[in-house]
Amino acid sequence: MTQTAGPRITGINHFSATVTDLDASVAWYQRLFGLDRVPFDFRHYEREETGYGVVLMDPRLGIAIGLHANTANRGEAFDECRTGLDHISFGVADRDELAAWVARLDELGIQHTGIRDEKEPMAYSTVVFRDPDNIQLEFIAFG
């Protein structure tokens, strides 16, 4: 059975993560990506009474990252074995760009896997690392 495609999507606009220490996470993501903080806080959709978010942006990179604090947060570390998010992957142009990101991660003292090359089911390379709340992040280049 062939599925019909929906309307066109031009890309992912942003992602948002709930974090245990908003200030520490804002500083970490700003250091890594060089993002600017949007100068106001956003109320968390459908949790306005307990949560709010900060948005970090860089139009040059075409990326926006939302970080949310919530008073109902129990302070547990992220675990991809629970229902919800597994990881977030950032595409880069090629393996040389991956090497540049490895150097950046090393400069900031962020532990990572190093570049891992895969051939199946297609040729790609990744670098995997984690944010302060243990959310798995990766850079990926195809080819």
Language-model region placement:
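Vicinal oxygen chelate
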Residues: 1-8, 12-20, 54-55, 59, 76-143, ...
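N-terminal beta-strand motif that seeds the catalytic metal site of vicinal oxygen chelate
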Residues: 1-26, 49, 85-90, 143
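Short catalytic micro-motifs in class I SAM-dependent methyltransferases
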Residues: 14, 33, 138
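Core segments of cupin and vicinal oxygen chelate
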Residues: 18-64, 69
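A short, acidic/glycine-rich surface segment
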Residues: 39-42, 72-77, 114-115
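Acetyl-CoA-dependent GNAT
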Residues: 68-74, 142
